[in-house]
Amino acid sequence: VIFFKQGLMPAVDANGKIILEQKGKIAMTPDGHGGCLRGMCRSGAAEELKKRGIDCISYFQVDNPLVNIIDPYFLGFHIKSGSEMSSKMIPKAYALEKVGHFCELGGKMCVVEYSDLPKEYQERLDKNGQLEFRAGSVAIHILDRGFVERLGGSGEGAKLPFHRADKKIPCVDADGNQI
Protein backbone atom coordinates (compact mmCIF):
# COMPACT_ATOMS: atom_id res chain seq x y z
CA VAL A 1 0.00 0.00 0.00
CA ILE A 2 1.29 3.43 -0.95
CA PHE A 3 -0.29 6.67 0.26
CA PHE A 4 0.11 10.02 -1.46
CA LYS A 5 -1.59 13.38 -1.23
CA GLN A 6 -3.95 14.40 -4.00
CA GLY A 7 -3.84 18.01 -5.17
CA LEU A 8 -6.41 20.70 -4.54
CA MET A 9 -7.93 23.37 -6.73
CA PRO A 10 -10.12 26.42 -6.02
CA ALA A 11 -13.85 25.72 -5.79
CA VAL A 12 -15.99 27.73 -8.20
CA ASP A 13 -19.70 28.50 -8.41
CA ALA A 14 -22.00 27.73 -11.36
CA ASN A 15 -20.66 30.84 -13.16
CA GLY A 16 -17.00 29.87 -12.71
CA LYS A 17 -16.41 32.46 -9.96
CA ILE A 18 -14.07 31.39 -7.13
CA ILE A 19 -15.92 30.91 -3.84
CA LEU A 20 -14.74 31.62 -0.30
CA GLU A 21 -14.65 29.13 2.57
CA GLN A 22 -14.45 32.04 5.01
CA LYS A 23 -13.75 35.73 4.60
CA GLY A 24 -10.40 36.08 2.83
CA LYS A 25 -9.92 32.30 2.35
CA ILE A 26 -10.58 30.53 -0.95
CA ALA A 27 -12.55 27.27 -0.72
CA MET A 28 -10.48 24.38 -2.05
CA THR A 29 -11.61 20.99 -3.38
CA PRO A 30 -9.76 17.83 -4.48
CA ASP A 31 -8.63 18.06 -8.11
CA GLY A 32 -10.53 14.97 -9.26
CA HIS A 33 -9.56 11.76 -11.02
CA GLY A 34 -7.07 13.48 -13.31
CA GLY A 35 -5.54 15.12 -10.27
CA CYS A 36 -5.21 11.74 -8.64
CA LEU A 37 -3.20 10.50 -11.61
CA ARG A 38 -1.02 13.62 -11.48
CA GLY A 39 -0.63 13.12 -7.72
CA MET A 40 0.59 9.55 -8.22
CA CYS A 41 3.29 10.82 -10.55
CA ARG A 42 4.29 14.00 -8.72
CA SER A 43 4.50 12.29 -5.33
CA GLY A 44 6.78 9.55 -6.62
CA ALA A 45 4.14 6.84 -5.99
CA ALA A 46 4.18 5.72 -9.65
CA GLU A 47 7.98 5.48 -9.56
CA GLU A 48 7.79 3.46 -6.33
CA LEU A 49 5.33 1.06 -7.98
CA LYS A 50 7.77 0.66 -10.87
CA LYS A 51 10.63 -0.12 -8.45
CA ARG A 52 8.45 -2.78 -6.81
CA GLY A 53 7.59 -4.33 -10.18
CA ILE A 54 3.90 -3.41 -9.88
CA ASP A 55 2.28 -2.78 -13.25
CA CYS A 56 -1.46 -2.79 -12.39
CA ILE A 57 -3.20 -0.38 -10.02
CA SER A 58 -6.55 -1.05 -8.35
CA TYR A 59 -8.38 2.31 -8.36
CA PHE A 60 -11.72 3.00 -6.69
CA GLN A 61 -13.63 5.63 -4.73
CA VAL A 62 -12.82 6.09 -1.06
CA ASP A 63 -16.53 6.12 -0.14
CA ASN A 64 -17.14 2.56 -1.41
CA PRO A 65 -16.62 0.28 1.63
CA LEU A 66 -17.82 -2.82 -0.24
CA VAL A 67 -15.24 -2.80 -3.04
CA ASN A 68 -13.19 -5.97 -3.48
CA ILE A 69 -9.83 -4.18 -3.47
CA ILE A 70 -7.99 -6.90 -5.39
CA ASP A 71 -10.47 -8.84 -7.51
CA PRO A 72 -8.45 -11.65 -9.13
CA TYR A 73 -11.04 -12.24 -11.87
CA PHE A 74 -11.18 -8.55 -12.78
CA LEU A 75 -7.39 -8.28 -12.69
CA GLY A 76 -7.04 -11.39 -14.87
CA PHE A 77 -9.58 -10.05 -17.37
CA HIS A 78 -7.71 -6.76 -17.52
CA ILE A 79 -4.34 -8.42 -18.15
CA LYS A 80 -5.70 -10.94 -20.66
CA SER A 81 -7.51 -8.23 -22.66
CA GLY A 82 -4.34 -6.14 -22.96
CA SER A 83 -6.18 -2.99 -21.88
CA GLU A 84 -4.55 0.05 -20.31
CA MET A 85 -7.67 0.68 -18.24
CA SER A 86 -10.57 -1.59 -17.31
CA SER A 87 -13.76 -0.55 -15.50
CA LYS A 88 -16.50 -2.48 -13.76
CA MET A 89 -20.13 -1.84 -14.57
CA ILE A 90 -23.48 -2.80 -13.12
CA PRO A 91 -26.87 -2.76 -14.84
CA LYS A 92 -28.68 0.37 -13.70
CA ALA A 93 -31.52 -0.31 -11.25
CA TYR A 94 -33.71 2.43 -12.77
CA ALA A 95 -33.49 5.07 -15.49
CA LEU A 96 -32.44 8.08 -13.40
CA GLU A 97 -30.07 6.24 -11.06
CA LYS A 98 -27.19 8.57 -10.18
CA VAL A 99 -24.33 6.63 -11.75
CA GLY A 100 -22.12 7.36 -14.73
CA HIS A 101 -23.15 5.84 -18.05
CA PHE A 102 -20.81 3.78 -20.22
CA CYS A 103 -21.19 5.16 -23.75
CA GLU A 104 -19.33 5.03 -27.02
CA LEU A 105 -18.37 8.54 -28.01
CA GLY A 106 -16.35 9.22 -31.14
CA GLY A 107 -15.47 5.53 -31.42
CA LYS A 108 -14.12 5.37 -27.87
CA MET A 109 -15.66 3.95 -24.71
CA CYS A 110 -16.15 6.58 -22.02
CA VAL A 111 -18.25 7.32 -18.96
CA VAL A 112 -20.73 10.18 -19.21
CA GLU A 113 -21.83 11.34 -15.77
CA TYR A 114 -25.55 11.31 -14.95
CA SER A 115 -25.40 15.07 -14.47
CA ASP A 116 -24.17 15.46 -18.08
CA LEU A 117 -26.53 13.02 -19.84
CA PRO A 118 -29.93 14.56 -20.62
CA LYS A 119 -32.90 12.92 -18.87
CA GLU A 120 -34.44 11.83 -22.19
CA TYR A 121 -31.29 9.81 -22.98
CA GLN A 122 -31.23 8.27 -19.51
CA GLU A 123 -34.84 7.13 -19.99
CA ARG A 124 -34.50 5.99 -23.63
CA LEU A 125 -35.40 2.34 -24.26
CA ASP A 126 -33.97 0.05 -26.93
CA LYS A 127 -36.01 -2.21 -29.24
CA ASN A 128 -36.18 -4.86 -26.48
CA GLY A 129 -37.65 -2.43 -23.95
CA GLN A 130 -34.45 -2.17 -21.91
CA LEU A 131 -32.67 1.04 -21.04
CA GLU A 132 -30.42 1.99 -23.95
CA PHE A 133 -27.87 3.40 -21.49
CA ARG A 134 -28.09 0.70 -18.83
CA ALA A 135 -24.40 0.08 -18.11
CA GLY A 136 -23.71 2.03 -14.93
CA SER A 137 -20.25 2.90 -13.67
CA VAL A 138 -19.41 1.96 -10.09
CA ALA A 139 -16.02 3.72 -10.43
CA ILE A 140 -13.94 0.57 -9.87
CA HIS A 141 -10.99 0.43 -12.24
CA ILE A 142 -7.71 -1.31 -12.99
CA LEU A 143 -5.09 1.03 -14.47
CA ASP A 144 -1.76 0.11 -16.02
CA ARG A 145 1.07 2.00 -14.36
CA GLY A 146 2.37 3.15 -17.78
CA PHE A 147 -1.07 4.58 -18.57
CA VAL A 148 -1.02 6.53 -15.29
CA GLU A 149 2.50 7.78 -16.00
CA ARG A 150 1.50 8.93 -19.49
CA LEU A 151 -1.67 10.74 -18.39
CA GLY A 152 -0.51 11.95 -14.99
CA GLY A 153 3.04 12.93 -15.85
CA SER A 154 4.27 16.27 -17.07
CA GLY A 155 4.85 15.16 -20.66
CA GLU A 156 2.76 15.63 -23.79
CA GLY A 157 0.18 13.01 -22.70
CA ALA A 158 -0.74 14.95 -19.57
CA LYS A 159 -3.51 17.04 -21.11
CA LEU A 160 -6.47 15.75 -19.10
CA PRO A 161 -9.48 18.07 -19.23
CA PHE A 162 -11.20 19.27 -16.08
CA HIS A 163 -14.75 18.04 -15.61
CA ARG A 164 -17.13 20.17 -13.64
CA ALA A 165 -18.69 18.36 -10.67
CA ASP A 166 -21.60 20.14 -9.01
CA LYS A 167 -21.19 19.77 -5.24
CA LYS A 168 -22.63 21.59 -2.25
CA ILE A 169 -19.72 23.42 -0.66
CA PRO A 170 -20.15 25.59 2.44
CA CYS A 171 -19.17 29.13 1.51
CA VAL A 172 -19.46 32.79 2.45
CA ASP A 173 -19.92 36.03 0.55
CA ALA A 174 -17.22 38.74 0.38
CA ASP A 175 -18.35 40.08 3.78
CA GLY A 176 -18.05 36.66 5.46
CA ASN A 177 -21.80 35.94 5.66
CA GLN A 178 -22.73 32.24 5.28
CA ILE A 179 -24.45 31.56 1.95
Regions found by a protein language model. Name each.
Residues 1-54:
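Conserved N-terminal catalytic core of the sugar/cofactor nucleotidyltransferase
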Residues 10-11, 65-67:
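Short, active-site-adjacent cap segments at secondary-structure transitions
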Residues 49-58, 66-70, 74-179:
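Catalytic core of tubulin tyrosine ligase-like
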